[in-house]
Design a protein with these regions (language model features):
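Hydrophobic h-region of N-terminal signal peptides that target proteins for export
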Residues: 8-17
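Positively charged n-region of N-terminal signal peptides that target proteins for export
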Residues: 1-4
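Alpha-helical protein-protein interaction elements
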Residues: 6-9, 97
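N-terminal targeting peptides and non-cytosolic leader segments immediately upstream
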Residues: 18-120
Length: 120
C-alpha cells in the first residue's frame, strides 16, 4: 500500500479479497496515527470533523475515552459521544472483530489524548 501524507491525515488504498478495493484513510495528529478507517460515502470527513472538535475541548482525560456498543455497533466514545463507529469493512481490513478494533482504537486515543493541547 502506498501512502500519501496530506496535513493531518494519510490517504491510501488497499486491495482486499481479489477484486474488492476499499479506500482507507488514516486519522493522524502530531505524528500519531489514531486509526485507519474505510472511507465509504465520505465517512472520513465526519470522523475528522468530530476529532477536530475534540481537539478544541480543554480537559479531556484518557479516562473519558472508551470502547462501547452503541445501537448494536462497536464505537470509540469520548465523554459519552461517538467519535467513530467500527464498520464491518473496517474489521475486515484490519482482520479482527469490530469489538476488538474499537478497543484498540480507544486505547490508542486514550494513550495520547492528554497530549493534544487546544489552540484556543
Amino acid at each position: 500500500m502506498k501512502t500519501l501524507m496530506i496535513g493531518m491525515l494519510a490517504v491510501g488504498s488497499l486491495g482486499l479479497m481479489g477484486s474488492k478495493v476499499f479506500q482507507v484513510k488514516s486519522l493522524a495528529f502530531s505524528g500519531v496515527r489514531y486509526f485507519s478507517i474505510v472511507d465509504k460515502n465520505n465517512r472520513f470527513d465526519t470522523v475528522q470533523e468530530r476529532f477536530n472538535a475534540l481537539c478544541l475541548v480543554h480537559g479531556v482525560k484518557s479516562s473519558d475515552v472508551s470502547s462501547a456498543s452503541v445501537n448494536g455497533n462497536w464505537c470509540v466514545v469520548v465523554k459519552g459521544k461517538v467519535l467513530v463507529t467500527v464498520t464491518k469493512e473496517d474489521a475486515t481490513v484490519h482482520m479482527t472483530s469490530a469489538k476488538k478494533l474499537s478497543e484498540m482504537w480507544a486505547k490508542k486515543l486514550s494513550d495520547n489524548i492528554e497530549s493534544v493541547t487546544p489552540l484556543n
